[in-house]
């Protein structure tokens, strides 16, 4: 390293000598001789390997977002936040990293995907895996027993994501949760209603919400002959049924997880069933499942849930699916997952799911894990998979070649003649002070045509044009970019006229 630094210094000095000789207009022979020395030194130096090897890119599983992409995101977030607020939720925020012990033991087999951090102070830290566990920690720390909250923030998972399908290592989650002791299934039904409202409002296609109950799963495993120690690992296998065939799931359970083939077959008889409230009624009459206390409680709650979903008018969007397992360890009751459906090729075929876009469930024991006295706070919630939704919306807009505005500018302050920069600056300041979203070009004497073209490219609807005659008459020429219609507006009336044309309230109360 020291030798390289010395050579670099010699190259620098020789380069300065060559430049000096050229400025002094020295003889061509002398300059040529010194240039040869410079080239020889550069050859000795060789290429800078550190610069050659460095590739400018974002880390694996992350990406930058262009103004166009961010405009799409803001619209999606706006739909989600308005829905959360409509249902009476407060907003909170928590640190992006937590103590490692806060996160460990909460995610089952997915714990291996948690990002660990190195901290000079000696604390063992991890990036948050989701927003649910930090929320439970927040409740326990603040001794809260009743809250309805939403939280939109980034989470981190150390897996191998398929970025083309909207899966990343760093991504946003939009969570809504209800904490507190309430009568059964009322908060759960509201969470499902919120999920359906958001997915319908976003207009991303037909969807289906699968529901199940962790107690039904555990009861089913018990009567099929699965040992308690294997409940969670078998659960994670069953959860793959939406992606792979039953045969593949069975092979994993038998070959990799040591389950007896006859036990796997008994599980298969159950987990391949799905339907509505009629399936709940059918299973309540099942001679084996109905004898299991846990399963019976879960089925009873699901029957009640379907009653409330019918009252909310969303029962046609819900399917009771015994294969839904949700791999996270902290779920204790009802679980659900929304999937987008792609239209079947042939009439009469089953709709085909093309990806999960929202999920959630009940987790009554999670807060108690953090409370010193183990006090439980029942919770139920949902999480919207916005990255998947962003990908779908972006693809749709690209296919339609639809133009998206990336700014909210309402008016461009323009000039028709030269030497009117001061007047433009005064006017744009007046508009900003009045709450108008306004811009001007950063040139002293821009051409009017260039100013109008900028408006068309940026989607700015109005142009306020200042000219020498307008200044004498005390008016501003207001031009519609799309219709090209121009009207003279008195300067004192300009703010109200812009607000009227752009649909902005005339006063801020």
Swiss-Prot record:
Brain, heart, liver and kidney. PANTHER family: HISTIDINE--TRNA LIGASE, CYTOPLASMIC, HISTIDYL-TRNA SYNTHETASE. NCBIfam families: hisS. The lineage of its organism: Eukaryota, Metazoa, Chordata, Craniata, Vertebrata. This is Histidine--tRNA ligase, cytoplasmic. L-histidine binds at residues 130-132, 157, 173, 177, 326, 330-331. GO terms for biological process: histidyl-tRNA aminoacylation; mitochondrial translation; translation; tRNA aminoacylation for protein translation. It is linked to Usher syndrome 3B: A syndrome characterized by progressive vision and hearing loss during early childhood. Some patients have the so-called 'Charles Bonnet syndrome,' involving decreased visual acuity and vivid visual hallucinations. USH is a genetically heterogeneous condition characterized by the association of retinitis pigmentosa with sensorineural deafness. Age at onset and differences in auditory and vestibular function distinguish Usher syndrome type 1 (USH1), Usher syndrome type 2 (USH2) and Usher syndrome type 3 (USH3). Charcot-Marie-Tooth disease, axonal, type 2W: An autosomal dominant, axonal form of Charcot-Marie-Tooth disease, a disorder of the peripheral nervous system, characterized by progressive weakness and atrophy, initially of the peroneal muscles and later of the distal muscles of the arms. Charcot-Marie-Tooth disease is classified in two main groups on the basis of electrophysiologic properties and histopathology: primary peripheral demyelinating neuropathies (designated CMT1 when they are dominantly inherited) and primary peripheral axonal neuropathies (CMT2). The modification N-acetylalanine is found at residue 2.
């Amino acid at each position: 390293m020291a030798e390289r630094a010395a050579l670099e210094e010699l190259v620098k000095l020789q380069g300065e000598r060559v430049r000096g000789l050229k400025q002094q207009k020295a003889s061509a022979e002398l300059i040529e001789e010194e240039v040869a020395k410079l080239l020889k030194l550069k050859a000795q130096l060789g290429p800078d390997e550190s610069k050659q090897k460095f590739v400018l890119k974002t880390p694996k599983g992350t990406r930058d977002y262009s103004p166009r992409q961010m405009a799409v995101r803001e619209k999606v977030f706006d739909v989600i936040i308005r829905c959360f607020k409509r249902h009476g939720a407060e907003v909170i925020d928590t640190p992006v990293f937590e103590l490692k012990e806060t996160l460990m033991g909460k995610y089952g087999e997915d714990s291996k995907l948690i990002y660990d951090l190195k901290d000079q102070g000696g604390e063992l830290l991890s990036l948050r895996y989701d927003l649910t566990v930090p929320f439970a920690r927040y409740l326990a720390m603040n001794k809260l027993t009743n809250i309805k909250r939403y939280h939109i923030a980034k989470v981190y998972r150390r897996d191998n994501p398929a970025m083309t399908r909207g899966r990343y290592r760093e991504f946003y989650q939009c969570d809504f949760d209800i904490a507190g002791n309430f009568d059964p299934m009322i908060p759960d039904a509201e969470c499902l209603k919120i999920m359906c409202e958001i997915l319908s409002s976003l207009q991303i296609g037909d969807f289906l919400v699968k529901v199940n109950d962790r107690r039904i799963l555990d009861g089913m495993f018990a009567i099929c002959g699965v040992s308690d120690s294997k409940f969670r690992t078998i659960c994670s296998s069953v959860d793959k049924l939406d992606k792979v065939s039953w045969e593949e799931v069975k092979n994993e359970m038998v070959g990799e997880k040591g389950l007896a083939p006859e036990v796997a077959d008994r599980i298969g008889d159950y987990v391949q069933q799905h339907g509505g409230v009629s399936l709940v009624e059918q299973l309540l009459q099942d001679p084996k499942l109905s004898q299991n206390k846990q399963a019976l409680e879960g089925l009873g709650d699901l029957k009640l849930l379907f009653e409330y979903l019918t009252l909310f008018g969303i029962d046609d969007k819900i399917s009771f699916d015994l294969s839904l397992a949700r791999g996270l360890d902290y779920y204790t009751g009802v679980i659900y997952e929304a999937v987008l459906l792609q239209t079947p090729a042939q009439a009469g075929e089953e709709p085909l799911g093309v990806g999960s876009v929202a999920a959630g469930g009940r987790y009554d024991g999670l807060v108690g894990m953090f409370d010193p006295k183990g006090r439980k706070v029942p919770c139920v919630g949902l999480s919207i998979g916005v990255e998947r939704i962003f990908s779908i919306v972006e693809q749709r807009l690209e296919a339609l070649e639809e133009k998206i505005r990336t700014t909210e500018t309402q008016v461009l302050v323009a000039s028709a003649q030269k030497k009117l920069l001061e007047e433009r600056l005064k006017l744009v300041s007046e508009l900003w002070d009045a709450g108008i979203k306004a811009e001007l070009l950063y040139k002293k004497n821009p051409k009017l045509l260039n100013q109008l073209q900028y408006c068309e490219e940026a989607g700015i609807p109005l142009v306020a044009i200042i000219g020498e005659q307008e200044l004498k008459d005390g008016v501003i020429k207001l031009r519609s970019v799309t219709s090209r219609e121009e009207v003279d507006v008195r300067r004192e009336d300009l703010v109200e006229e812009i607000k009227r044309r752009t649909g902005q309230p005339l006063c801020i109360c």
